[in-house]
UniProtKB/Swiss-Prot annotation:
Disulfide bonds: none annotated. Coiled coil: none annotated. The keyword Cell membrane applies. Keywords: Cell membrane, Membrane, Transmembrane, Transmembrane helix. This is Uncharacterized protein AF_1460. It comes from the Archaea. It comes from Archaeoglobus fulgidus (strain ATCC 49558 / DSM 4304 / JCM 9628 / NBRC 100126 / VC-16). The chain crosses the membrane at residues 15-34, 55-77, 92-114, 121-140, 145-167, 180-202, 206-224.
Amino acid sequence: MPPPMIPPKLPPLEFIAAEALYSSIIFLICFLIYHRLREVYKLSDYRGFHFFSNTFLFLGLAYFLRFVVLLLSASGVMFEEISLEGLRGIMAFSMAFLAYSGSAAILYTIYSLLWRWLERFPGEVVINGVALVIALTSLLSRMPLVFLISQLALVFLLVAAIFVNYSHFRHESRSKRAYPLYILLFVFWLLNISLTFRFLPLEFRFAIYTLSVAVILIIAYRVLRKL
């Protein structure tokens, strides 16, 4: 999931350009992965693909919003035609939506691993409810640390879900093909969580962008060619 939005101070132009390019690439790749997984789900009727595809739906939505906000920043609309209070409101809304969509993406990944134990459980209702609570908490607190802690907690839950699923289904051919995808997603989220640390030099951020794009491209290759 993307890091929370930058405070209302115009960042360097190269930073905005890199962020916009990065966000657009991730959004487009997520759209392709989502479309392919929906096709596989319709052909196989395997519910795990439905939940897993929603991971990339919400991840793509998060990066699409970030791309739009960054374009507004680059054009100067937000900084020249909107008051400071209005700008803060837009940033707060963006942070809340990113917290919601990013949390929903991780929760859908977790549920795609555990749904066979929770078939009678209203999983999607709970996923959206928990994501909404995280978003509202981030909005009301206005503290990036709250967002960071919530995402770290969800990522650790993902690790636990991977181990639980692996211990029961590691001999299934479908599961064997899926585990590398989950591990790559774990790496992707760790890389993006590290972007919430504002003290990172631009060179480090650009390196993380490059690694993140490489990881999501590998995921796309495995989904588009091997599923």
